[in-house]
């Protein structure tokens, strides 16, 4: 587990300060929560940002993705800034849906790890443990037809990603050494 989550209220206060500085006005985070269903590659925090604007209270649901501080991460090389950059480039240069990004912090001094924020979309989160295609609500609460629609939409979206010109997105510099994908990973 990430040590900073042990002090959830301290994390909440640090995020309030950071977001306030980036937005140029005071914000509050009434409560932080960690979703029951979460991925294995990042620590995920859910919260609402609230603030006053024109005499009215405003609110935005947000997700914070924190780089894990574990000894054996899911990925051999972990670059949270690159994840953010890729989503930003795709969001600005295509009509492929990506999260609305709200900020990136690469300085680990604030929370002990890098993190980024994105607008939260309401919905159910498929679990990684157990894998959602083997057990859990997607297997037991959806019909075969619903799963087919979901999987086809995922494949169609993946195909759209592969049609993007990585050079136009500025990713030609991301060359990994090795001729094959396996060699590049090793």
Stretches with model-predicted labels:
Residues 33-186:
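ATP-binding pocket architecture of kinase catalytic cores
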Residues 1-32:
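Juxta-kinase regulatory segment immediately upstream of eukaryotic protein kinase catalytic domains
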């Amino acid at each position: 587990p990430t040590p900073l989550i042990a002090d959830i209220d301290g994390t909440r206060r640090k995020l309030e300060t950071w977001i306030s500085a980036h937005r140029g006005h005071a914000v509050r985070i009434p409560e932080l929560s960690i979703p029951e269903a979460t991925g294995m590659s990042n620590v995920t925090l859910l919260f609402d940002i609230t603030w006053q604007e024109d005499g009215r209270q405003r609110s935005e649901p947000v997700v914070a993705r924190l780089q894990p501080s574990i000894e054996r991460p899911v990925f051999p090389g972990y670059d949270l800034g690159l994840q953010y950059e890729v989503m930003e480039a795709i969001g600005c240069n295509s009509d492929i849906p990506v999260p609305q990004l709200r900020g990136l912090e690469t300085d680990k001094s604030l929370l002990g790890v890098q993190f980024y924020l994105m607008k939260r979309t309401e919905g159910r989160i498929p679990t990684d443990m157990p894998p959602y295609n083997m057990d859990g609500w997607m297997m037991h609460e959806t019909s075969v037809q619903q799963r087919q629609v979901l999987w086809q939409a995922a494949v169609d979206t993946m195909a759209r990603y592969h049609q993007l010109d990585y050079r136009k997105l500025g990713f030609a510099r991301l060359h990994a050494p090795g001729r094959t994908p396996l060699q590049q990973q090793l």
